[in-house]
């Protein structure tokens, strides 16, 4: 399933936003949106581009001298790249989902199809990732080549031994492709590119108004928490299939980052909520709430704290390990994210006079 969020049909006036007591809105939503673009969104994508460049370098080093040490280094950079990309989930709109760029299926379509990756490696034609299946060209495909299917020391030795010829050519192509897509995210949001940040702040282009822009930003916070709960934790945990575990339906099972990515998604929500990223404080959705119903803010803060505590209690376990060895802990994460989703979708939405619409990933 692609890591998708809002489709273009939702980005107009697919939601209703009211004003305070029928009067003028006492909060400058355009200033909030402009701040989020410059303080949170663009810096996150710039960091993603930087990490993607480091991943390209690390895999080139790995292919130039395959060893357990260079493999471990490439894996570390892969994890760092996934971490920062996961922290962009709360603004997975516009160029992420919409044509002509529609970057999401090019970067993080999951789960990976190992058989399709192997077909590409076995092929004799030139590598054309634009024409390759989404399930064989994204970050999960890189994870497959770096981690294999089974893990363990024997698998690591086999991975190192196989890193030559077309396999390395494909790995290099994948990481170069991801660096190009990361740069494309930056260009799409930048004033010297598509200026999607400007469209968002000014309520133009894709957006019908500043009201619509602000509503879309808030909706994405709700959708992200719902997707973490339902798709990234709940589905593998058997919450959507009558108790049947769906361990293969993880975002990054092979790289062991499914839990970490889900937690990073929540941190992404919190970054937009607070308007803060990398120690730079801007204006966030929390400020909008403080202008309308400040008494509710501590409840939201407590909900975020509960989610972080539940994730932290699982330590460094993979989702497979946690489900097998600490299902109560996984349940605690699921419930904490559900509580956060509820306070956002019900209490905060009511306070902001925003009607949350249909989540386009619901039912996937």
Residue ranges and their predicted role:
Residues 21-23:
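Ser/Thr-rich, Pro/Gly/Ala-heavy low-complexity intrinsically disordered linkers and tails
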Residues 25-364:
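Mature extracytoplasmic or organellar-lumen-exposed domains after removal of signal/transit peptides
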Residues 1-9:
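Bacterial N-terminal signal peptides that target proteins for export
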